[in-house]
């Protein structure tokens, strides 16, 4: 697929969050190195691996030389950070990995903020559209100023994820609801979305 659409696929990630202790699809680092080498022989795009910031400090040091760039995940709200601490914590996560591996490009491939929570894994009061809006404003300002390529997580809510509880935080990371309604962060960035939504309801 990557070779068929080289103008669309700009890089290939060999796995996602597969070396952290809490994953249900754990892959040992030597196996990951083997997979990366095999993929690099098969595609022309840069090859990476996506992981939480912590394993890049030590566990993945043997993997780093095999990659074209490091893909980093950072979620302050999962680590019980208040909104006023959030962007500084994201910057610290990025800087710690960049300093650990000088000369290797680092891309943030997941950063986000939940909009609802039942208290599992984060304080319920820390998850809201208002706080997501504030975090994304800070994140976009910092990433532009610092020149750090950043991908946000995620476009749409995923109500099938996590537990059956409707307030399960895994379900509520989207910039849009599952039925494509823009949340506050998108309304702030693109006010025209609201007028477009109103027009579509009238029409």
Question: Where do the model's predicted regions map?
Answer:
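Acidic (Asp/Glu)-rich catalytic clusters
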Residues: 1-8, 61-66, 99-101, 144
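Active-site groove signature of glycoside hydrolases
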Residues: 1-27, 57-58, 108
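Aromatic-lined carbohydrate-recognition surfaces of secreted/lumenal glycan-active proteins
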Residues: 14-16, 36-57, 103-114, 148-160
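Surface-exposed amphipathic alpha-helices with a cationic face
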Residues: 28, 32-44, 94-102, 140, ...
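Glycoside hydrolase catalytic-domain groove-lining segments
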Residues: 75-120, 148
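Aromatic-rich peripheral "rim/lid" segments of glycoside hydrolase catalytic domains that contact
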Residues: 124-128, 142-203
